[in-house]
Amino acid sequence: MRVLVKLSGEALSGEGGRGFDPERVDYIVKEIKSAIEEGFKIGIVVGAGNLFRGVELKNLTMARADQIGLLGTVMNSIYLKDIFERSGLKARIYSQIVNLPDVERVNYDSIESALRENSILIFAGGTSNPFFTTDTAAVLRAQEMRAKLVVKATKVDGVYDKDPKKFPDAKKIPHLTFSEAMKMGLKVMDAEAFALCKKLGITVKVINFFEPGTLLKALKGEDVGSTVVPD
């Protein structure tokens, strides 16, 4: 089974949400390695929030601020590749926005070859264009690696009818459609990502990635997190 895991940049950072935290990164490696060992084919899209925040770039034009963010995802991807390989895993980076020795152009034959050798695919540079989020990039790259599942790795154990951090009475919604999520105004993903999921028939699983073993449970179809399906 092929799956695209969407990681925020903050997932790589520790207290304060900046930079790289060795313990946090080791945890990510352990969770991904468990999935690889069970035979799952893994792709990753990572954000850049640990390096750059939108508020810090607010004085720039949106296009240039987005370009800085896209380059941040390349930096995070190179970091992840090195850590994965030091842990005995194979990893390859794909991006359309930079020309670096460790970064390949997106090529379907190369992607298929990498998956056959159980390499982790790390997609950097978003969609290659400004104005699109890494949520949209995750869905696009899932389609390119022929995955029908995107796992959104968060700090919350699923989708709620309102923010559980602010409202103690928030109710978890285990299963819903993209149309229902949009109608309820739930910020699972942005509208462009939702529309692409519906068009391509891709399911999104929202999990608390930082509960040990949850990723593997989600991939095995166990009842964790929330599942958002095309309608």
Language-model-detected regions and their locations in the chain:
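C-terminal catalytic "cap/lid" subdomain
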Residues: 1-231
